[in-house]
Design a protein with these regions (language model features):
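A short beta-strand motif that forms part of the nucleic acid-binding face
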Residues: 64, 74, 93
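Short, conserved catalytic or adaptor-binding loops enriched in Gly and charged residues
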Residues: 41
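Helix N-cap motif at beta-to-alpha junctions
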Residues: 61-68
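RNA-recognition motif
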Residues: 47-54
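Intrinsically disordered, low-complexity polar/charged tails and linkers
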Residues: 1-37, 45, 84-106
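Short amphipathic alpha-helices in soluble, non-transmembrane regions
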Residues: 30, 70-77
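Arginine/glycine-rich "motif VI" loop of SF2 helicases in the C-terminal RecA-like domain
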Residues: 78-83
Length: 106
């Protein structure tokens, strides 16, 4: 019986802040929070990868089994480099193409 590969989910997240948040700073904050909450082993199982960032909206990738955990990580981010922020998941999809299409329609 064939083994199915790892399924991925793509999460669109929006950053609310009075100041501009850089792409690198956001993705580093997410990665640091993953390591803080779940450790190195959990971080490897989550399969987190930054994909895209533009105008305060980012797309990240994770393993489909770890979507609730990555949502918890994102909700725990309250500041990035001393800048107070609120980060929220706005949409989840199985493909980048569909996710971008849904974001464009909103």
């Amino acid at each position: 019986m064939p083994v199915r590969g790892i399924r991925r989910r793509y999460l669109a997240i929006k950053i609310y802040s009075e100041n501009v948040v850089k792409e690198k700073d956001l993705f580093n904050a997410i990665e640091n929070k993953i390591n803080f909450l779940y450790g190195v082993v959990g971080a490897s199982r989550i399969g987190y990868r930054p994909i895209w960032f533009e105008n305060g909206i980012a797309i990240i990738r994770c393993n489909h089994l770890w979507v609730p955990q990555i949502r918890a990580v994102i909700s725990h981010i309250q500041e990035i480099n001393g800048i107070p922020v609120m980060v929220q998941v706005i949409r989840i999809s199985g493909t980048i193409k569909t996710l971008k299409k849904k974001l464009k329609n909103e």
